[in-house]
């Protein structure tokens, strides 16, 4: 039974390695430059960089607390 398990695990491993070998890869420097370019192009729409207008912020309290 142990030999059967080992063979099954080896087949799964080989299949996974074949899948990973077929993945198209790019250089890290190319990926980094593409990512920086994307970030620079979309920075004006990023609410973390430009903020959210108070009129559009769904989390802002509509009324102040009466107790305070």
Curated annotation (Swiss-Prot):
InterPro entries attached to this UniProt entry: G-protein_gamma-like_dom, GGL_sf, Gprotein-gamma
UniProt keyword annotations, A-Z: Acetylation, Cell membrane, Lipoprotein, Membrane, Methylation, Prenylation, Transducer
Principal location: membrane
GO molecular function per UniProt: G-protein beta-subunit binding
Positions of S-geranylgeranyl cysteine lipidation: 65
Compartmental location: Cell membrane
Modified residues (Cysteine methyl ester): 65
PANTHER family (UniProt xref): GUANINE NUCLEOTIDE-BINDING PROTEIN GAMMA SUBUNIT
Family from the record: Belongs to the G protein gamma family.
Name of this chain's protein: Guanine nucleotide-binding protein G(I)/G(S)/G(O) subunit gamma-7
């Amino acid at each position: 039974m142990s030999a059967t398990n080992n063979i099954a695990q080896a087949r799964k491993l080989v299949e996974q390695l074949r899948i990973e070998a077929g993945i198209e890869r790019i250089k890290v420097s190319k990926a980094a430059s593409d990512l920086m370019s994307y970030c620079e192009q979309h920075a004006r729409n990023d609410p973390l960089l430009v903020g959210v207008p108070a009129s559009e912020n769904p989390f802002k309290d509509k009324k102040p607390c009466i107790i305070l």
